[in-house]
């Protein structure tokens, strides 16, 4: 009979086959599978077998230690994450060392940056071998910081990548955190720049960008603008200055401006022959009745030109309601689009994420009960979806029409085919990354690398410190 090991809620273990002399694991008998933090996961074929390459930051909040490995794939498995979303993960088999015992376990690979532990030890890996004392921790011994430093010192890497600035307003937003993390994980120096704290020197001989009281921003290779609608004018001015300084931007200022002006964007879509709901725009209240008739009558959608994330969008269910809202908005000098309501969509739409002229991910969004807006910020839900070829073509064409490198393209399914709703130049990452499990932030960083012709240096094979 095998002697069982008693462990606490967290323990240090090692995975020698991966070159991990020590990694802290969360012990969770409530989880069936074990998982390991991994990123830059790339599948490939070797001797007609499926393999993956991946990288690991074994120490929480320390990205200077990077280990790269290649492993054969056992399978791909659906695993329900903490948000209740099922992710498809690669599964590998590795030898686990826990205390003085060792045995093979299966590990699923996923990005655990948002979680407190780089590894989770689930019940399938412990059955018949481990007893868990949930009130204890480090039952098999703890490690001091200096011990960890000695173990991982040979594996620390200096950042020799690009210097990339994220131009935004709040570094704590999910999308911004993910972009900063993704850049660091690929070996780049990431810097957050608050839009409002940047200011410029306009000089044809020596244009400059200053930040927070006089610091001159120099040697930046690329900028990712993530500009809030409320600061579009200033944010685009700052982005243009970076462009004037010869710095690559992931979405230039003019395409961002086009995407923020719903009327201009719609006119560009029409010019490029892209299918969209019938839309009307007028200035005088005398034209209200004909404007409503123009788009097929009520019910219809009313959109403020300056709205975003579902704000400033109203469903007018009757002719009288539509007239009242339109005339009220005109009396306030608010610019308003009137748009055909696509009833057969049933409160659903598609969000296609486009990077570098390709749809890299897509979700179907469903409106919350009692609402017609499917935006996740308005309480809608999302799930991964396989889009049709004509939907993929429409998303890519819309992005090109505006000149964007990265975009979230909203499409609605109708009886006459896919219709283009809107293109977002700063698409949120949380909903779509959670629903699909795809590292979209990493793909955005890779697009910067592609634009600049930067080739990532292969990391050396890991060595276990003695």
Curated annotation (Swiss-Prot):
Sequence segments annotated as region (Alpha-L-glutamate ligase): 162-466
Pfam families: RimK, Rimk_N, Zn_protease
GO biological process, one term: translation
EC annotation from Swiss-Prot or TrEMBL: 6.3.2.-
Binding site for Mg(2+) 1: 410, 422
Stretch list, region Unknown: 1-161
Alphabetical UniProt keywords: ATP-binding, Ligase, Magnesium, Manganese, Metal-binding, Nucleotide-binding, Protein biosynthesis
One MF term in the entry's GO annotations: metal ion binding
Keyword Transferase included in the entry's annotation: no
Family: In the C-terminal section; belongs to the RimK family.
Name of the molecule in the record: Probable alpha-L-glutamate ligase
Organism field: Parasynechococcus marenigrum (strain WH8102)
